[in-house]
């Protein structure tokens, strides 16, 4: 990720030169902390200490930025930050355990909640979220296939775990958060033949 410039420009008095990644990171951060309606060109320019010309160098309008934010968040490039790429290389039981324990990491869910909420009102973002969910489902389903479950059993077990994760995203403020031990207990049930 590109380094965030300081508010008001660089120490030399010259305005920082921002990349597309800088803009999408700043937009995503604002989306997470304040919601979709807070993401405005003037607000981001103030936050980043640059003029609107810098924004228009990368984007045609705010919708173009929002598309880039959605793409960044749900892309396979972000799978490393989400932990998907590293878990695929682990032994299968450890892979499931790692994915399960990701469910109790509050930091990961802030952006997830914001993007999923945004997807409810934007069909393009909803499509990106569906593609992300499908990638996650595939990783989990493949893990159950590796454990020797047939295709139907693997899909049902993977669905149980993936839907539990999505439910946690939406229920985490009103329901008790599962502990690592409870996640482990669920995984023990799911891997039992």
What does each model-found stretch correspond to?
Residues 78, 106-113, 123-148, 155-159:
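Amphipathic alpha-helical packing segments from all-alpha helical-bundle domains
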Residues 1-18, 149:
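N-terminal intrinsically disordered/low-complexity leader segments
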Residues 60-64, 86, 120, 124, ...:
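Residues in soluble alpha-helical coiled-coils and helical-bundle/repeat scaffolds
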Residues 68, 79-113, 157, 161:
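Hydrophobic alpha-helical connector segments
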Residues 41, 71-77:
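Short, basic, alpha-helical segments at the C-terminal edge of helix-turn-helix-like DNA-binding modules
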Residues 22, 26-34, 80-84, 115, ...:
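Solvent-exposed, amphipathic alpha-helical segments
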Residues 126, 130, 145-193:
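Hydrophobic/aromatic-rich alpha-helical bundle segments in the mid-to-C-terminal region
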Residues 19-22, 26-68:
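Helix-turn-helix
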């Amino acid at each position: 990720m590109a380094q965030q410039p300081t508010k008001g420009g660089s120490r030399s008095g010259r305005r920082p030169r921002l990349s597309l990644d800088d803009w999408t990171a700043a937009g995503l951060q604002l989306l997470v902390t304040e919601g979709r309606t807070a993401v405005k060109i003037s607000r981001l320019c103030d936050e980043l200490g640059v003029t609107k010309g810098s924004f228009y160098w990368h984007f045609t309008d705010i919708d173009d930025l929002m598309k880039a934010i959605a793409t960044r968040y749900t892309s396979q490039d972000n799978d490393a930050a989400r932990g998907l790429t590293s878990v695929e290389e682990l032994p299968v039981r450890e892979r499931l355990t790692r994915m399960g324990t990701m469910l109790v990491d509050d930091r990961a869910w802030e952006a997830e909640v914001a993007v999923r909420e945004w997807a409810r009102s934007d069909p393009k973002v909803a499509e990106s979220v569906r593609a992300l969910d499908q990638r996650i489902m595939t990783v989990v389903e493949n893990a159950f296939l590796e454990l020797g479950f047939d295709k139907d059993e693997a899909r049902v077990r993977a669905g149980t775990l993936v839907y539990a994760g999505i439910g946690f995203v939406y229920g985490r403020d009103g329901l008790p958060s599962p502990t690592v031990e409870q996640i482990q207990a669920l995984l023990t049930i799911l891997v039992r033949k």
